[in-house]
């Protein structure tokens, strides 16, 4: 009988209008299974979030701010052309292409963009540009390349920060229309906030005074004879400006005539200041961080200084993200012959966007997490580690699924709203997952995982077949090469063979087809195992998107089926049970009534023999 009620609790959803209505039934089912010592009872709850945009985050330690690299995504746009052009190979364009000569024309947008990059960095107008175009990796003689296919937009939009972050960065524009708002963290979640101020000033340059453009300016058809104007660099705003001299980076700076854009600092010392911060898990021992406001570089005192030019730090990428423009001064003559020399026309714009290049680290801005910050981002952000909303609970604790949650409405008033955010799985509760009724998510999840396993198995088989085909092509090509080699040896036999004739080292092909075929065979075996494992699962009908809508109705239908099938038996048993109980009750009542009458009233015993009629008393 207990099993029947357990089945009813699992199958029958009490209300189809509210998706959280089955949560109390799950708790009740769990308690019944525990009290009856059922084999379906589990000692653990596994609670997952049903909202794909929801996650939890913990603040990253201060060492992440110094050691986490970032990648640059650089695009530019020019006046004569519409759209943006991506510079995807800065190394090749800057090392091999040198437009700063008199023989080059600058109608090509790529040439103009690279020329401006060289011009800005070589003249020192924008000192930070050196770090953007000449970063060298350690132990590698190559330059930094811009990030390919960055992931724009937020990854999660409902991220909750569990504790206070040691460091935050803030940036706001005076004109909000020019900015892309990413989110705003409250002041209580930030131990210290660095304020980045976008540049509102510009710097002018007369090309005739630059050494690199002197030869180009002598040509009659030379371009850019008019003065240029550049966007200025951003700056840091400090609440406690306590500066001290700090050494500049000249050890890893390389300057050569072939790379004039790699401008090295002239002064051996710059200006820095210290911050006293606290780690997220240690609020008793402060940590001192040194900040270089010129290059937007941070360093923890007592820690080894990271390679200065190996990567951009998060503060560097956040500060330099933006759009920087170049204008040309056009001197015009008005009708009254007055000369107007203060009109600048837009020539070219650079857009710098940076992406985190370390797995597991994200920018948290408000409640949204990002890998790449937009060029003109605006808001308050910090670095975090994030993880999904998963909880493990013991068997003696009720699933914490609130039927009501307080959410912020449009009129900024907290009001209760039905919002279940946890999805409990009963580990070992085979009835719910096997039948897939009442709880549509379990059946849908099983179907999706089955389809995913099938697709993965087919993909592995295709990869194995492709590898085998490529190996067969290589084997046939090797056979052709060996035939040609033998023919060449016969032709050049009089001169000692092909190698002696070419005066080169003899090279031979080492056939490793056995290793490749073994790898392909292992892939096929894994695909076969996945296929068998997928076939062993319950074969659900391929209803696609209709399955989540159909499964909630299966519970009531099955309940009605069981009721119609066993209803007559149950009614017969119930009638017989009531009749028996009624008969026993009537008999007991009548017996008690008779006994009571006999005890309360006295009756005389009738004589056994009747008196003699002819006997007359005297």
Curated annotation (Swiss-Prot):
It comes from the Eukaryota. Residues 18-545 are extracellular. Residues 482-498 are annotated as: Immunosuppression. GO terms for cellular component: plasma membrane. Residues 1-17 form the signal peptide. Synthesized as an inactive precursor that is heavily N-glycosylated and processed likely by furin in the Golgi to yield the mature SU and TM proteins. The cleavage site between SU and TM requires the minimal sequence [KR]-X-[KR]-R. The CXXC motif is highly conserved across a broad range of retroviral envelope proteins. It is thought to participate in the formation of a labile disulfide bond possibly with the CX6CC motif present in the transmembrane protein. Isomerization of the intersubunit disulfide bond to an SU intrachain disulfide bond is thought to occur upon receptor recognition in order to allow membrane fusion. A motif (CX6CC) lies at residues 499-507. InterPro entries: TLV/ENV_coat_polyprotein. Highly expressed in placenta where it localizes to syncytiotrophoblasts of the labyrinthine zona. Specifically localizes to syncytiotrophoblast layer II (SynT-II). Also detected at very low levels in ovary. GO terms for biological process: labyrinthine layer blood vessel development; myoblast fusion; myoblast fusion involved in skeletal muscle regeneration; skeletal muscle tissue development; syncytium formation by plasma membrane fusion. Disulfide bonds join 44-47, 44-507, 499-506. The chain crosses the membrane at residues 546-566. It holds the Pfam family TLV_coat. Residues 567-618 are cytoplasmic. Glycans are attached at residues 27, 184, 274, 357. The keyword Nuclease does not apply. CDD domains: HTLV-1-like_HR1-HR2. Induction: In males, up-regulated in regenerating muscle tissue after injury. A motif (CXXC) lies at residues 44-47. Residues 422-442 are annotated as: Fusion peptide. Disruption phenotype: Viable, although growth is retarded and neonate numbers are reduced. In the placental labyrinth, formation of syncytiotrophoblast layer II (SynT-II) is abnormal with reduced cell fusion and progressive expansion of maternal blood lacunae. Unfused SynT-II cells form dense plaque-like structures between adjacent cells, which resemble cell junctions and are associated with high expression levels of GJB6/connexin-30. Formation of syncytiotrophoblast layer I (SynT-I) is grossly normal. The mature protein consists of a trimer of SU-TM heterodimers. The SU-TM heterodimers are attached by a labile interchain disulfide bond. This endogenous retroviral envelope protein has retained its original fusogenic properties. Together with Syna, participates in trophoblast fusion and the formation of a syncytium during placenta morphogenesis. Synb is specifically involved in formation of syncytiotrophoblast layer II (SynT-II). Promotes myoblast fusion, and may play a role in regeneration of damaged muscle tissue in males. May have immunosuppressive activity. Belongs to the gamma type-C retroviral envelope protein family. This is Syncytin-B. The gene is Synb.
């Amino acid at each position: 009988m207990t099993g029947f009620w357990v089945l009813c609790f699992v199958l029958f959803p009490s209300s189809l209008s509210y998706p959280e209505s089955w949560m109390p039934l799950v708790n009740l089912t769990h308690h019944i299974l525990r009290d009856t010592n059922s084999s379906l009872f589990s000692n653990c709850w596994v609670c997952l979030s049903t909202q794909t945009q929801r996650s939890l985050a913990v603040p990253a330690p201060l060492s992440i701010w110094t050691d986490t690299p970032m990648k640059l995504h650089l695009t530019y746009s020019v006046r004569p052309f519409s759209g943006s052009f991506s510079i995807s190979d800065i190394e090749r364009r800057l090392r091999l292409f040198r437009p700063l000569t008199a023989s080059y024309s600058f109608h090509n947008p790529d040439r103009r963009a690279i020329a401006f990059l060289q011009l800005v960095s070589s003249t020192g107008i924008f000192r930070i540009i050196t770090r953007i175009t000449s970063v060298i990796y350690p132990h590698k003689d190559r330059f930094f390349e811009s990030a390919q296919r960055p992931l724009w937009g937020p990854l999660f939009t409902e991220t909750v920060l569990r504790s206070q972050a040691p460091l935050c960065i803030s940036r706001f524009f005076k004109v909000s229309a020019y900015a892309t708002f990413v989110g705003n963290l409250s002041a209580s979640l930030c131990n210290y906030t660095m304020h980045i101020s976008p540049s509102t000033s510009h710097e002018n340059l007369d090309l005739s005074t630059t050494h690199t453009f002197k030869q180009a300016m002598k040509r009659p058809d030379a371009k850019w004879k008019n003065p240029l104007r550049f966007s200025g660099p951003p700056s840091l705003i400090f609440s406690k400006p306590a500066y001290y001299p700090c050494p500049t980076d000249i050890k890893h700076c390389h300057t050569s005539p072939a790379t004039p854009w790699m401008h090295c600092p002239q002064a051996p010392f710059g200006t820095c200041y210290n911050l006293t911060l606290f780690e997220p898990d240690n609020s008793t021992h402060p940590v001192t961080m040194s900040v270089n406001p010129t290059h937007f570089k941070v360093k923890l005192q007592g820690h080894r200084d990271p390679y200065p030019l190996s990567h951009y730090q998060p503060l560097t990428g956040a500060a330099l993200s933006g759009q920087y423009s170049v204008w040309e001064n056009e001197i015009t003559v008005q009708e009254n012959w007055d000369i107007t020399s203060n009109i600048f026309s837009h020539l070219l714009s650079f857009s710098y966007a940076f992406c985190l290049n370390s797995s597991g680290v994200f920018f948290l801005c408000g409640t949204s997490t990002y890998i790449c910050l937009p060029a003109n981002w605006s808001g308050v952000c910090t670095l975090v580690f994030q993880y999904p909303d998963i909880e493990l609970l013991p068997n003696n604790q009720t699933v914490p699924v609130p039927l009501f949650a307080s959410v912020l409405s449009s009129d900024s008033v907290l009001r209760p709203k039905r919002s279940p955010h946890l999805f409990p799985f009963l580990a070992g509760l085979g009835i719910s997952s096997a039948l897939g009724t009442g709880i549509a998510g379990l059946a849908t999840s099983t179907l999706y995982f089955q389809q995913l396993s099938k697709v993965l198995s087919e993909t592995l088989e295709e990869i194995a077949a492709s590898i085998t085909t490529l190996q067969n092509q290589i084997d046939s090509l090797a056979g052709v090469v060996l035939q040609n080699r033998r023919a060449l040896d016969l032709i050049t036999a009089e001169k000692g063979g092909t190698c002696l004739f070419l005066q080169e080292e003899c090279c031979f092909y080492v056939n490793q087809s056995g290793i490749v075929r073994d790898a392909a065979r292992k892939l096929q075996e894994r695909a076969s195992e996945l296929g068998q494992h997928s076939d062993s699962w319950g074969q659900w009908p391929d209803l696609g998107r209709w399955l989540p809508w159909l499964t909630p109705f299966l519970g009531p239908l099955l309940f009605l089926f069981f009721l119609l099938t066993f209803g007559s038996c149950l009614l017969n048993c119930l009638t017989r049970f009531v009749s028996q109980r009624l008969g026993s009750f009537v008999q007991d009542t009548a017996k008690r009534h008779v006994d009571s009458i006999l005890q309360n009233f006295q009756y005389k015993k009738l004589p056994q023999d009747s008196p003699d009629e002819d006997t007359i008393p005297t």
